[in-house]
Amino acid sequence: MIKLGTYDTGCKPANPKEYFAKIHEGGMTPKKQFRGESKGEWLDFSSSPGNQVATIQNFLKERGFFPFGKIDGLCGYRTSSSMRLFQEYVRSVERDASIGAPDGMFGRQSLSHMKRWHKKAIEADWNQFTSADAQPEFKKWMVLLSKIRSHYRTQPTALLRKISAFGDATDSLGVNNWDFDPQRIHLIGIRRNEAKPGKRENDDVFVLLINGVVFKFYGTTDPGKSTNSSGAPFLVHGQHRYRFGWHKQFDDQKVYRALKPRSSGVLIIRDSNRDFALTPDDLAGRLENNASINIHWGGRGVSNWSQGCQVICGRGYINHNNDMIDCSSFAATTYSTLGKKVDNVFQTKGAYSVLVDLVTAFSGSEYALDYMLIYEGDLKIDPGFGANMAVKINAVMNKE
């Protein structure tokens, strides 16, 4: 079994402390171990005779799952993500259930599928696309982003003017600095029903533009709860720089990989009357820079876990072929079932893991993406795009 922490003969890092210092964060309990999937699970290095890890890495690289990976004979976080991405591809694109739930561990079944691909010279169908030669839908989203930028450069809202004038360090960009380079990875959050008071639902949509293809997820961009006496934080409209990091890094039982503000934090405004609605009065409030607004997992999607973070639910997603992919059988509802079997199916973070694995595989050495938060009304800026696009996507995501 090849899994996180497995290394080929002679490929264990000479200085494990230095190795983990580069990939873990300062708030985490210092450990010379890999963070596993289940609650409180930490994995030691484990040796495997021969060069099986390197063989798997070479295969994944050739077939489109490990394009920026290093062939080093060590199954680290990037290799494990690429292995899980291959498993999900076989399950969801080839529709071959024999591989089982994607768990990032290569045993007999995964290795047999790897041999099948090698024998038949199969590769991921997304290899036919690049940022320069992209899917038509990818191009449509990029055109929409460009039109949104042009619109707000000439007609900035009061909030966008405040963001541009913000004088301190922040990872939130003023409208004149919004950058939609198609070679970069872009995640678009579409905020819906933000002015509606009361219980916040998982009714928002996320669109991942990556290497010329499009994936769609659902969750929430709005806080559903908050313990802050000043009111819940709402991430502001516009583009923000994010990087890979760790969510809940001070809790070694629950810490897991997530996207965090690139350096100093992102700009928020407070829900001053604490009604969990984003109103004109709130928008007129003071900007704050906040380093804790992460993009993270939200369970299967039963309730809103956000306290201001951007939250991706695990129940399902729409893949690059525009197929709705159901992950509910292996999408954990809570931390307590992560990494365990429920009805004999290994539980992961489901669709959220797909997003993480895609960004891990295709982010290069930067391990980062650009996050653009727009309003549903912004879809109307491009009349040919479809103002009800987010409604349609959300309806598909929440279909029982």
Language-model regions: role of each:
Residues 5, 38, 46-47, 237-240, ...:
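Glycine-centered small-residue hotspots that permit tight backbone geometry or close packing
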Residues 122-299, 317-320, 325-399:
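Cell wall/extracellular polymer interaction/catalysis modules
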Residues 56, 102, 204-205, 308:
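Conserved beta-strand and immediately adjacent loop positions that scaffold enzyme active sites
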Residues 1-148:
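Cell-envelope/ECM-targeting effectors and their regulatory/trafficking segments
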Residues 306-320:
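Short beta-strand-centered segments at strand-helix junctions
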